[in-house]
Every structure is written in structure tokens, then in C-alpha cells.
């Protein structure tokens, strides 16, 4: 799930933190990818007539189809992917996982009912909601990656947190995930939409944590407190607290402790904090997640030549894939993983350090830009209010 509305908050209040561009712009870069999130998206997206793809034996193959062809697209564009798999979820995440499981059970029942009485649209909608990534899906994807020569590692707990460790250490350029909570784990750069299909034509979003903090005017602790208030995987959100209110509360009070104190002492009881809301434990999980250090031997990885015959046996013989397509894919892998060895030009040059005067000038321009955006929003809100107050038919 990640952090609710965080992308909206960053793009509106720290626009300089977000860059969008084509996948080819990341040629020559190593990227750590949240595997479990990717597999989940493959199970939802890679379908035929609203149903997951199946082998002749009735086994789901959507995850393998997605992993094979989306990884090929990444490698075709000169990127060297490293996949990171989730380990056991933190205990605090249990409540959220239980809720998701209950929602999936309800969706499964609704899906069965839609089969009997509903439209094809209803069936597809409820079918997507029943999707969950199983241990078997993960193990089959690991087997496929090994045959492709693409490395993967297992995280002790959260894959996003391990991706962030590797990015901070410079072992990869960025962490790639659709989950915005990757930024809470201090990933310097987050890439989104990297494993999307080419048909979706979604640009790659590149979000820089330092610029997000600068634009929001927050330190990392305040940023994490904001994310907890927005709603994260560890805690349910406070009812009636949306993105604008969450941002206002953190800016006004500076920390979750003071926000909670203000809410509980409010005689009007405008907001009510859930009975079981251990925000300090959630904050600790973001600050000190269970991860392996970047220099741990289990975090070593390298790209190798694909095992062509192994791929044929697994994908073609066992799973019913097209042999021509698999052989073609293996050839592309072998060729493009070699070309991805070429360094980006930026690797040969050290960035020139800005003077204090230049930094002050950039900050002034940034502040002016933020003020201009706020002014424009106020004017737009005022215009909307006036338009609503105007009688119908009045000019």
C-alpha cells in the first residue's frame, strides 16, 4: 500500500523533487527493484479475458510472463536490474495484513457471485482484488531470474528498506518500487513505473528525497511523522485527517507527539485517534528497519550470461511459453547485459560544489516558486468559492 497521498503532497509542495522521463534516460544504471511489489503488479496486469494466464496444467503464469518480458524491457534500455524480495513482515504490519486478507476474502466471495450474476466488468474488478503473491510465485520468479542471469537477494523483512540501504551505499543508483514508503526508509532516489509495460506509456517518475525534504521544509523525522499521519502499512490513518490536514498539523506542531497532544486536548474533539495507534513503534520501524548492511556478503550480486537451455526447459517445456520468443529474449539478455557495462558519462565527472552565494540564490528562487504556487492556489480556491456562491445563470 505504501503511504497514502504522499506523491500528491510532494508534487504539490516540493515540485523540484520530482522528475519524469523515458526509461532510456537511465541507461547504464544499476537499480534495486522491489520484487514483491512488481510480482503483485504482474498478477494484476498480465491477463487474458480478465483472468490470469495459465499453463496447460492449470498453473498461473502471469507472474512469470511479467517478470520475463518486463525485465527484458529494462535490460533492453541498458539498465542492470537487481531484484530484492520481501522477508517476514514486521509484527506491527500484522494488523494491516490481516485487514488486507479479510478484504481479499470478501472480494473472492463477490467475484464468485459476479460469475453467476454480474457483468464481465464486475468479474474483472473483483478478480483483481483477490490477487495475492504466494511463496510459490516468489520461488518461481527467483528460479526464472537465476536462469536469466539477473541477480536477486532476500531481505530480512521489507524489500523497500533493503533497496534503500543499497541505494544509500551507492551499490545501485536508485530503489525502484510503486510504494512511496521507500522514501521513509531513506532511499535517496525512488523510481516508479520502471516495471510497467510499454503499452501503458507511463513516464518513469524519479523522486529525490533531499529535494522533497527541502521543499516541504522538514527534517527526516518530521517527514516520517507526516507519512505516518497520512496513513502507512503499519497503522490505520486517523479518521478525517487527509493530506492537507496532515501537512498542516505537522507544520504547525512539529512532531507527532505534539500533534497527538493537541488532538487529545481539543475540547471540540474534531479528530479521534484510534485506540491502538502505536505511532512511536511505526516510526522506529522506519528509522531502524531490519536490514542487511550493504557490505554483507548476502548483498553481493553480479549479472551473468543467461542459461538458454534452462530457460527453454522451465518456460517452454514446463510452462508452455513460445520457444522462439524465449530464445529471442535470451539473446537480447546476453547482448544487452554486455552493453549495459558501458558507464554513463556522468560517472567520469565530479559535480562542481556550489558556493554559499549560489546556494542562497537557489534557495531564494525555490522559496519564491513555492510562494507563487501558494498564491496561485489561494486565488484558484477563491475563484471556485465565488463561482459556487454565484446564483445559477448569473454571468
From Swiss-Prot:
Residues 1-104 are annotated as: N-domain. One of its GO terms (cellular component) is nucleoplasm. Its cofactor is Mg(2+). Its EC number is 3.1.-.-. It comes from Talaromyces stipitatus (strain ATCC 10500 / CBS 375.48 / QM 6759 / NRRL 1006). Belongs to the XPG/RAD2 endonuclease family. FEN1 subfamily. Interacts with PCNA. Three molecules of fen1 bind to one PCNA trimer with each molecule binding to one PCNA monomer. PCNA stimulates the nuclease activity without altering cleavage specificity. This is Flap endonuclease 1.
